[in-house]
């Protein structure tokens, strides 16, 4: 049975792939769960149209990610003031949300906190820390975040 996958199926393929499977697997598992559709000329043309649109969207997203990377790496100083103990240790920690707010406050673009990668799970000391922002699977921006003690 020839099918076109509509979802990612382990050990079989990705959405849009045309696969040949045994009749029982196709009829009893893939088709009822909506993981595949029966392959036909019309369905194949539709899949090709969807692939072209996805490729165009991927190129557009890559261009946008490169623009965001230039904007982030072009920021002169991204700093954050937090409460600290006398030894330079923070009360609490700096999270991805705090970093996203610091980027926006420094005049940078709005960044989703889930795309920010901290050097460790959280920043717990003052000083300069290198932060990575994953904007696209192929584009990562890096910048330095200065964490300072807040004036009490």
Swiss-Prot record:
One of its GO terms (biological process) is translation. Disulfide bonds: none annotated. Keywords: Ribonucleoprotein, Ribosomal protein, RNA-binding, rRNA-binding. GO terms for molecular function: rRNA binding; structural constituent of ribosome. One of its GO terms (cellular component) is ribosome. The keyword Ribosomal protein applies. It comes from the Bacteria. Binds to the 23S rRNA. Belongs to the bacterial ribosomal protein bL9 family. This is Large ribosomal subunit protein bL9. It comes from Nocardia farcinica (strain IFM 10152).
